[in-house]
Amino acid sequence: MAEAGVAAASLFGADRRLCSADILPPAEVRARIEVAVLNFLAALTDPAAPAISALPLISRGAANRGLRRALLRDDVSSVYLSYASCKRSLTRANDAKAFVRVWKVMEMCYKILGEGKLVTLRELFYTLLSESPTYFTCQRHVNQTVQDVVSLLRCTRQSLGIMASSRGALIGRLVVQGPEEEHVDCSILGPSGHAITGDLNVLSKLIFSSDARYIIVVEKDAIFQRLAEDRIYSHLPCILITAKGYPDLATRFILHRLSQTYPNMPIFALVDWNPAGLAILCTYKYGSISMGLESYRYACNVKWLGLRGDDLQLIPQSAYQELKPRDLQIAKSLLSSKFLQDKHRAELTLMLETGKRAEIEALYSHGFDFLGKYVARKIVQGDYI
């Protein structure tokens, strides 16, 4: 269990009001791992040293979270973690395995960086499962430990040699030029679109060319393909992007790059009217709590296009569904957060009061071509929050 405390000096850099993770070259990350090991060995050999479990991690608990609010209209708000620390203790039964996992993951990252390789979280899990099955019995152990290492070394996940496992795709009024000079015209692709690589190093080098006026983030692949099949971007100059569900890091990264390249191009989200849909929108908009040290690198000023409460009149009663226990859990978490803005909170409250949820596909009751018209009308009329 993490034990919160007042932050002391971290291994790398003075603690600040807003903690962050740095993008570092492999040699610097390996050097930080070496420093962590030397500090640990020094504590072992020094009889006057405090407990050897002094791993200065940043707490991801609710009390240590905050929202870096935008000061100007076009600025972006993002989730951040403050200075409160926590410990992984070798002497505490509940913490011992988590303590060992941190060193195991750092050892693996040191090796990966030395070989000049990149691995996914899934690949890392299976490697650790093979080498240390006692400590890594599920993917969650790896995911949480990687965030502990990010917290300890104050470097991004990509800097550790761990790349995103991307499901994302994009299509529309966009030409992408890769590092090898190849060009992809996303307006002439099939409805599956252009697959987004999980290598953030490659994504950071892409060159964009676009005459689009809008970016539309779509929760579901099926909706993305419907809009792509209808070629909505032919009459509504836009770029469509999807992570096919909960946003992965690579999709968030390329969306952020697009927002930086085209700062005057508004971003709209098309998600289901349920707590999970709102959670997805908030992840794009503010970043994720689990990656609080680097959330600001991927946050975008995303507007909620639909579905929203005002759209329920378009949906037949038979298309409504009851909220599920998982919906209620997500809603409770969102309502307790510090970043949920008033209009989003009102939508979530309406879901809970009615006990209902609705999916975007319910709009097909008006015909398959209605979805594109619905999206275009709401954008043109400024019907978003």
Swiss-Prot record:
Q: What is its EC number?
A: 5.6.2.2
Query: Does this UniProt record's set of keywords contain Hydrolase?
Result: yes
Assembly and partners are described as:
Interacts with TOP6B.
Q: Catalytic residues per the record?
A: 126
- Write out the entry's keywords from A to Z: DNA-binding, Hydrolase, Isomerase, Magnesium, Metal-binding, Nucleus, Topoisomerase
Family per UniProt?
Belongs to the TOP6A family.
Topo IIA-type catalytic domain residues: 24-169
User: Which GO biological process entries does UniProt record here?
Assistant: chiasma assembly; embryo sac development; meiotic DNA double-strand break formation; meiotic DNA double-strand break processing; pollen development; reciprocal meiotic recombination; seed development
Q: Which Pfam families does the record cross-reference, listed alphabetically?
A: TOP6A-Spo11_Toprim, TP6A_N
Alphabetically, the GO molecular function entries are: ATP binding; DNA binding; DNA topoisomerase type II (double strand cut, ATP-hydrolyzing) activity; hydrolase activity; metal ion binding
Can you list the GO cellular component terms from the UniProt entry? Answer: nuclear chromosome
Full protein name: Meiotic recombination protein SPO11-2
Q: InterPro entries from the entry?
A: Spo11/TopoVI_A (IPR002815), Spo11/TopoVI_A_N (IPR013049), Spo11/TopoVI_A_sf (IPR036078), TOPRIM_Topo6A/Spo11 (IPR034136), WH-like_DNA-bd_sf (IPR036388)
* Cofactor(s) required, per the database record: Mg(2+)
Functional summary from the UniProt entry: Required for meiotic recombination. Mediates DNA cleavage that forms the double-strand breaks (DSB) that initiate meiotic recombination.
- Write out the catalysed reaction: ATP-dependent breakage, passage and rejoining of double-stranded DNA
Protein localization: Nucleus
Q: Any S-S bridges, and between which cysteines?
A: none
Translocase listed as a keyword: no
